[in-house]
Regions:
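Bacterial N-terminal signal peptides
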Residues: 7-16
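Positively charged n-region of N-terminal signal peptides that target proteins for export
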Residues: 1-5
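Residues that cap or anchor secondary-structure elements
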Residues: 6, 19-242, 249-253
Length: 702
């Protein structure tokens, strides 16, 4: 018989604490270490596990957690104790991590502690009768589940704090623990009802204060079914003005700040004081090739509550940004399309002049959003010429792909220097100063070809995906698929370091149409997604979904190993979709991310009411097109998480990024009831359509 438990997810945040009697915000206490190390004598013997981060340490003991917080010369200890609990529960580390901890203190080897194992979770079994406690950590938050087995009484769960000054429940249901120089925030307990592989959100629980003690108040729930809380909706906000706004791409820095790029036709889009361009200059009526409005770039704080900077970029014509990349200093690299003769360019760049139709642009914005480090056109006069994907290498060189026609600038010795059709894909590598092209080449055959996305590996090879209708698209002998099987097929091409030859190139498709929207590279392997209309798309045995879901198109996910040949180079390929349509949107180009372990994170849009979901934040479609957010395991055979994201109007996921603190999504919504979180930067729908930015906390099915 399957286990049935009640799980309460609670989360304490160490950041964004407020001074007593003041609205001022304290900088974060630091990032929580995403691991727990077992105590092997490196600390007090009463401690079972500990988790260290800049400015604090968490010590897990038999029935309490001790938070030791430090800022400068100030320090404070706060203890959370589970009252009346089992004094000797079984305590186990779960999900061993590859890293080990070593302590070399002093010059006596007998005092050293080495090869201490680390874990991503710590489980307390039977901390109360038939009730377990599970701790998690990510970079900025400590989370714990309280798991209540069938017929156990959740009312016996009770905890208290020592070292705090006061407790209160905020208007949004969070528990606030006042300390000497701020507050610790415990998010309100979230509940989900499990029914097989699907989870249905239930009304949230709440905290009840009884003097200095804290208990849970829970809604009615079906005691015959599993009740769980996975995962957290970290934040969700609208982003826009009174007209149209759409987020096309997103990137996240190591601290958890989200950078969003897209387009807007709103003259009142929220630009910030001191940003590069604070006023709108775009063309809302005469846009050529569908390029209207201005680019926007917005940087949000880690809580999604405040805009750090937000700027327009554009001239008197139309612009749109489709790709964004970040360097280690927080500078943002952008690409897209412009038809503005006065698009902002900087001195000494490769191409300072616009053709007057549509041009590719590449712009490097500084870390404060206040000035352009460089900005250049790329292209001379092709109809519909745009940049769709951008990537940077460790030296700051920018790699761009998109579509272009005859006359697009190429470099001597490049793979293909002439376009012999209406439009080809292209790959251009700009030097770190933006003053010249290290190489620039067309990529395609004798018919229509588009480059949609690009990634760069550590050796400087460029991985490109897109689509081709050419019967002679260039493939390599080691390709998985040498020839076009339908009207339009996706492709994956790997260019050598100087853009002169293909290291690997394959088509990918069935008898219908396919496009490649996004590519990522991890340990030399290529991961891509897009849409397919082929029931015979080449899926692999054991993949998550081996049959076409229905409708006009499904999403797909594929992993390719260019070091192998033929069928061996297709590591896995799977459909992803229900009985409706998926990913039929030309501007969903930044919709895949990959973590270091090879897990894949996806967004897009679906009309399917039976789209595959697991542990959702939203279990059912809101209507029309809804965004989806999905995580696949490294084998491509199992969902780790999947959810709808949207309201009663149409919603499109257009960009996704992953950091260990969570999954970050941007896109476009037409829903006045798109889900937002309390305290979000913009909680109300203000335009014809708005961009959205959503973070989903990283607590996925293991």
């Amino acid at each position: 018989m399957p286990s049935r438990v009640l799980s309460l997810l609670c989360m304490v945040s160490f950041g964004a604490a407020a001074y007593a009697g003041s609205a001022k915000t304290i900088p974060s206490y630091g990032q929580v270490s995403p691991s727990f190390e077992v105590n092997r004598g490196q600390t007090d013997a009463r401690v079972e596990f500990l988790s260290r981060g800049p400015g604090y340490t968490v010590f897990l003991m038999s029935n309490q957690a001790v938070l030791s917080l430090k800022r400068g010369t100030r320090s404070q200890t706060v203890t959370m104790r589970f009252a009346g609990s089992n004094a000797r529960p079984s305590i186990t580390g779960l999900h061993s991590l590859p890293g080990k901890t070593n302590y070399f203190i002093g010059n006596e080897p007998r005092n050293w502690r080495t090869n201490i194992p680390t874990y991503s979770e710590v489980l307390y079994r039977h901390i109360y009768p038939s009730i377990d406690l599970l701790y998690h950590a990510n970079q900025r938050q400590l989370e714990f589940d309280v798991r209540v087995a069938p017929h156990a009484d959740p009312n016996i769960i009770e905890f208290s704090f020592t070292g705090s000054r006061a407790l209160r429940v905020a208007d949004n249901g969070d528990l606030l623990v006042t300390i000497d120089d701020g507050e610790l925030r415990f998010c309100r307990p979230h509940l989900y009802q499990s029914r097989g592989a699907r989870r249905q959100a239930l009304p949230d629980g709440s905290y009840v204060l009884i003097g200095e003690r804290v208990k849970f108040s829970l809604p009615s729930y079906d005691r015959t079914q599993t009740l769980v809380i996975d995962p957290m909706l970290g934040y969700s906000t609208f982003l826009g003005g009174s007209a149209d706004s759409f987020g096309n791409a997103i990137a996240v820095d190591s601290a958890g700040h989200a950078y969003v790029a897209g387009g807007t036709t709103s003259s009142d889009f929220p630009a910030t004081s001191g940003s590069y361009q604070q006023t709108y200059g775009g063309d809302n009526g005469g846009g050529y090739q569908g390029v209207i409005g201005d680019v926007f770039v917005t940087k949000l704080d880690v809580a999604g509550r405040r805009v750090i900077y937000s700027t327009y970029i554009g001239g008197s014509g139309g612009e749109d940004a489709y790709g964004i990349a970040l360097d280690a200093s927080g500078n943002a690299y952008l690409t897209g399309g412009t038809n503005s003769l006065d698009f902002p360019v900087t001195p000494g760049v490769w191409q300072p002049v616009c053709c007057g139709l549509t041009d590719v642009f590449v712009t490097k914005l500084n870390s404060t959003g206040s000035s352009l480090i460089y900005s250049t056109h790329v292209g001379v006069g092709g109809e519909g010429t745009r940049g769709f994907g951008i990537a940077i290498d460790g030296k700051g060189a920018a790699y761009v792909t998109g579509n272009a026609g005859p006359g697009f600038p190429t470099t001597p010795g490049a793979l293909k220097t002439e376009c012999n059709c209406f439009t080809d894909g292209y790959v251009t590598k700009l030097n770190p100063q933006g003053s010249n092209a290290d190489y620039s080449t067309f990529l395609g055959g004798s018919s229509v070809d588009f480059g949609e996305a690009i990634a760069v590996d550590t050796t400087g090879k460029a991985f490109v995906t897109g689509y081709s209708s050419s019967g002679d698209f260039p493939t390599t002998p080691s390709a998985f698929q040498l020839t076009n099987k339908g009207g339009v097929d996706a492709f994956v091409s790997v260019l050598n370091q100087n853009g002169s030859a293909l290291a690997y190139s394959t088509l990918l498709g069935g008898s219908g149409n396919e496009e490649g929207y996004k590519i990522a590279v991890n340990h030399g392997k290529a991961y891509l997604t897009g849409y397919t209309g082929s029931t015979d798309f080449p899926v692999t045995a054991g993949a998550l979904q081996t049959t076409y879901g229905g409708g006009s198109s499904d999403a797909y996910v594929a992993k390719i190993d260019p070091s192998k040949s033929g069928s061996a180079s297709l590591v896995y390929a799977t459909f992803l979709g229900g009985s409706g349509d998926e990913n039929l949107n030309d501007f969903q180009r930044d919709i895949l991310a990959v973590d270091n372990a090879g897990n894949v994170y996806l967004t897009g849009a679906t009309t399917s009411t039976d789209f595959p979901i697991l542990h959702p934040t939203q279990a059912t479609s809101g209507g029309g097109w809804d965004a989806y957010v999905t995580a696949l395991d490294k084998t491509g055979s199992r969902l780790r998480f999947s959810t709808y994201l949207g309201g009663s109007g149409d919603d499109f996921g257009r960009g996704i990024a992953f950091q260990s603190g969570g999954i970050y999504i941007t896109g476009q919504t037409y829903s006045v009831d798109f889900p937002t979180t309390s305290g979000a930067f913009q909680s109300g729908f203000t335009g014809t359509s708005d961009a959205f930015v959503t973070k989903i906390g990283n607590k996925l099915s293991q």
